[in-house]
């Protein structure tokens, strides 16, 4: 592939940039340790909007550093593969890995939602059985429904954070350190960016992709932190689709990653057949 201006003239470059932006936004919405711990931390320390922005930017910085290291390392290693006969096979192998990642993400999200629905149904059944004598309605807050979907390991981290920091005075340095450590968790989206950058063989376009991913991820994480500072529960009450959107975001991410894999697989297969 050529440089970024050439790709734009050929009409190919547009596919990668919007995909990276959308992937960063969707990844930021996916259930994950950093987002949950950030929200729990801000709520526990009764943080301000400024502190929420600091926390979100710190988490984004460390998370982005991991993506940059992976992407730059991939582009550096790709210099060893210059033969035209090898490149189509690399594209095909990368496509298989990307499609496998997309299928794993989709299956994991579906399984988690099914477990949540089964547990919620069991809770409702027990609740009706134990309180069938009570003629007064018992309403569960929207926040409880949203929290019920979170991974058990994720909830344990959030609860531990709230116990440790509840009511304590926290310095800006501690907030930055917490954000930096919270963003070091790798993600399937970073693997996708790595494989795409290997195939692009163009630093400008690869760097633009990673930058687009990073900026959209930063916007999402900062929004999550600010939302926690002004109360996530209030946001959920004002918009009933908030928890549904967060719950379904991994589906869109897996579909987007799958489309990227199909695109690369077609190009690799075409190159091999030629």
From Swiss-Prot:
Biased composition (Basic and acidic residues): 122-141
Keyword Transmembrane helix: yes
Disordered: annotated segments: 122-143
Sorted UniProt keywords: Cell inner membrane, Cell membrane, Cobalt, Cobalt transport, Ion transport, Membrane, Nickel, Nickel transport, Transmembrane, Transmembrane helix, Transport
GO biological process: cobalt ion transport; response to cobalt ion; response to nickel cation
Membrane topology of the entry: Multi-pass membrane protein
Cytoplasmic topological segments: 34-51, 107-174, 231-251
Spans within the Periplasmic topological domain: 1-12, 73-85, 196-209, 273-274
Principal location listed in the UniProt entry: membrane
Cellular-component GO terms for this entry: plasma membrane
Induction of its expression: By nickel and cobalt. Transcriptionally repressed by RcnR.
Cellular location(s): Cell inner membrane
Transmembrane segments: 13-33, 52-72, 86-106, 175-195, 210-230, 252-272
Similarity annotation: Belongs to the NiCoT transporter (TC 2.A.52) family. RcnA subfamily.
Role, per record: Efflux system for nickel and cobalt.
Protein name: Nickel/cobalt efflux system RcnA
Annotated organism of origin: Salmonella paratyphi A (strain ATCC 9150 / SARB42)
């Amino acid at each position: 592939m050529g440089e970024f201006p050439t790709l734009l003239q050929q009409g190919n470059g547009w596919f990668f940039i919007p995909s990276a932006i959308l992937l960063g936004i969707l990844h930021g919405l996916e259930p994950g340790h950093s987002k949950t711990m950030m929200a729990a931390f801000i709520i526990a320390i009764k943080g301000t909007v400024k502190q929420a922005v600091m926390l979100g930017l710190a988490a984004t910085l460390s998370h982005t550093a991991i993506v940059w290291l992976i992407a730059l390392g991939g582009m550096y290693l790709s210099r060893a593969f210059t033969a035209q006969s090898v490149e189509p096979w690399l594209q095909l192998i990368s496509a298989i890995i990307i499609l496998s990642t997309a299928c794993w993400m989709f299956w994991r999200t579906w399984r988690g939602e099914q477990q949540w629905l089964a547990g919620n149904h069991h809770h409702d059944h027990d609740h009706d059985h134990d309180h069938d004598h009570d003629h007064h309605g018992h309403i569960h807050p929207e926040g409880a429904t949203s929290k019920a979907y979170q991974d058990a390991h994720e909830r344990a981290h959030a609860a531990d954070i709230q116990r440790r920091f509840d009511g304590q005075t926290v310095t800006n340095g501690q907030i930055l350190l917490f954000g930096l450590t919270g963003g070091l968790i790798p993600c399937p989206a970073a693997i996708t960016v790595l494989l795409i950058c290997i195939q692009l063989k163009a630093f400008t376009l690869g760097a633009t992709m990673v930058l687009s991913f990073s900026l959209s991820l930063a916007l999402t994480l900062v929004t999550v932190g600010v939302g926690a500072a002004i109360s996530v529960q209030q946001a959920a009450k004002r918009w009933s689709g908030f928890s549904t959107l967060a719950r379904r975001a991994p589906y869109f991410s897996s579909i987007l990653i799958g489309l990227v894999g199909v695109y690369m697989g077609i190009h690799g297969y075409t190159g091999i057949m030629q």
